[in-house]
Each structure stands twice: as C-alpha cells, then as structure tokens.
UniProtKB/Swiss-Prot annotation:
It comes from Pongo abelii. Signal peptide: none annotated. It is found in: Nucleus; Cytoplasm, Perinuclear region. InterPro entries: MRFAP1. Residues 87-118 form a coiled coil. Found in a complex composed of MORF4L1, MRFAP1 and RB1. Interacts via its N-terminus with MORF4L1. Interacts with CSTB and MORF4L2. The keyword Cytoplasm applies. This is MORF4 family-associated protein 1.
Amino acid sequence: MRPLDIDEVEAPEEVEVLEPEEDFEQFLLPVINEMREDIASLIREHGRAYLRTRSKLWEMDNMLIQIKTQVEASEESALNHVQHPSGEADERVSELCEKAEEKAKEIAKMAEMLVELVWRIERSESS
C-alpha cells in the first residue's frame, strides 16, 4: 500500500447547514403536527369506546330487567295455579314451578357472565 498524496485526496463535499428556525419548520414541525393528530384521534376513539361500552351495559341492564319481569310473571302465574289446585294440576304446577326456578337460575347465571364479560371488555379497552 502506498501513502496518499495530498494532491490526490478529494475535498469533502460541503453539507448545507440549516438555521435552527429552518430546521424546526422543515423537520420537527411536521412531526409534531402529525403527533398531535394521532393524539386527537386516540382521544376520540377512547371516547367512542367508552360510549360503546356504556351502551352495551345499558342494553344488558334492560335485558336483565326484562328477564326479571318475565321470571316474576312466571312465578306469579305458578303461584296462582298452586293456590287454586284442581286434581292433577297440582303435580303439573309443581313441575312448572321447578322449571321456572331452574330457568331463573340459568338466566341469573347468564346475566352474571354477561356483566363479567362487559367488565373485561371495558378493562381491556381502558388499558
């Protein structure tokens, strides 16, 4: 390897150095504006997710009220039949009461599972 001759070495290219204001306007300002838009978008989506979750909870609450009303009506109907028995109707009423109680327990369990599911969804959306 031979030593370099100073005449053979090329002069380095000159790099344009921007003033701080130009550097800020050209490079940093667009990035900052884009980040602001992203943050605003995330805030809007968070609000929509919160409203969706609240809406689902409200729907579930209405469903539970309807189910409770139906179960109470079934119980009341069964009790009316029990109070005025007629022969074989006693046995049938007992069966219906048992079925109504089983259905009420199933519905209550389903309602608890729905509430737990919504809470999980709400927690996952908030994190």
